């Protein structure tokens, strides 16, 4: 601003000097051209006025044109300076307006962001409203499946408990038959009069019926300890499967017991045949 004021002062001085020169040159051109006529005004009034020569007119026009050019240049310089100062003022005003517009723009951006957040919240609420019935259906289906599994396991447990008395009866019947046959074999040997094979050795050998009876007792204890779990998990399911595997093994054992009397008869027949051979040799 100080530089602009100094330039304006210089331009003002140039304008004043140019104006003073122009006004001084044009004030009295006749006196400058003929200075001697001023001393004799009376004679000049009677004589006719003479025209100045052409050279003087040309010099006068040149002298008048020079101050006009200076005035023109000074005016142009002043206009340029004015525009420059006006441009600086405009830039300052623009900066001020920009500084004022920045908070307005930030406020507008915040308002837009809040609107976007509100829209996203609405979308999320709509999605949750659509997903809630799906979650409810899934939970109901899972509960129904769990109830079905519990019912199936409960029915399996009841069937196993119902089948245990039948197994006990089957296990007791083969035991009685083998006992009677063994008693008959003892009588046959006693009729010969020689006891080459003692009855203690036969009694000391464990029969498969004893194994099956022990396993049945263990199964009864397991069934008493086994209770229906309210909530089935993977661990209880694994226990149930291992228990079913043991049940299959016990069933095979009971089948072997059902076939046992024939094997026991063959074994007793073999022992009686060996006794007869030894008796014939000693006799």
Swiss-Prot record:
Signal peptide interval: 1-24
Membrane topology: Single-pass membrane protein
Region annotation (Disordered) ranges: 30-62, 164-207, 258-283
InterPro entries documented for this protein: CCDC107
Annotated compartments: Membrane
Keyword Transmembrane helix applies: yes
Coiled coil: 104-134
Segments crossing the lipid bilayer: 65-85
UniProt keyword Transmembrane, yes or no: yes
Keywords annotated in UniProt: Coiled coil, Membrane, Signal, Transmembrane, Transmembrane helix
Ranges of compositional bias, category Basic and acidic residues: 47-62
GO CC terms: membrane
Biased amino acid composition, Gly residues: 176-187
UniProt-recorded name of the protein: Coiled-coil domain-containing protein 107
């Amino acid at each position: 601003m100080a530089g602009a004021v100094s330039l304006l002062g210089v331009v003002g001085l140039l304008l004043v000097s140019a104006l003073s020169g122009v006004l001084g040159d044009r004030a009295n051109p006749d006196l400058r051209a003929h200075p001697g006529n001023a001393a004799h005004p009376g004679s000049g009034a009677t004589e006719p006025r003479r025209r100045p020569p052409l050279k003087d007119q040309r010099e006068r026009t040149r002298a008048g044109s020079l101050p006009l050019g200076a005035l023109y240049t000074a005016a142009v310089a002043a206009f340029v300076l004015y525009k420059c100062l006006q441009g600086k003022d405009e830039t300052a005003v623009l900066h001020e307006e920009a500084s004022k517009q920045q908070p307005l723009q930030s406020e507008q951006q915040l308002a837009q962001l809040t609107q976007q957040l509100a829209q996203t919240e609405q979308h999320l609420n709509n999605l949750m409203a659509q997903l809630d019935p799906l979650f409810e259906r899934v939970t109901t289906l899972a509960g129904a499946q769990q109830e079905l599994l519990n019912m199936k396991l409960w029915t399996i447990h009841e069937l196993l408990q119902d089948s245990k008395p039948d197994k006990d009866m089957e296990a007791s019947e083969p035991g009685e038959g083998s006992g009677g046959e063994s008693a008959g074999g003892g009588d046959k040997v006693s009729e010969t009069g020689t006891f080459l094979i003692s009855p203690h050795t036969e009694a000391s050998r464990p029969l498969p019926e004893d194994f099956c009876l022990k396993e049945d007792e263990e199964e009864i204890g397991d069934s008493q300890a086994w209770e229906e779990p309210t909530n089935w998990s993977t661990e209880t399911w694994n226990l149930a499967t291992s228990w079913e595997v043991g049940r299959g093994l016990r069933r095979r054992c009971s089948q072997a017991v059902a076939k046992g009397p024939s094997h026991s008869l063959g074994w007793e027949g073999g022992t009686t045949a060996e006794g007869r051979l030894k008796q014939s040799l000693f006799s």
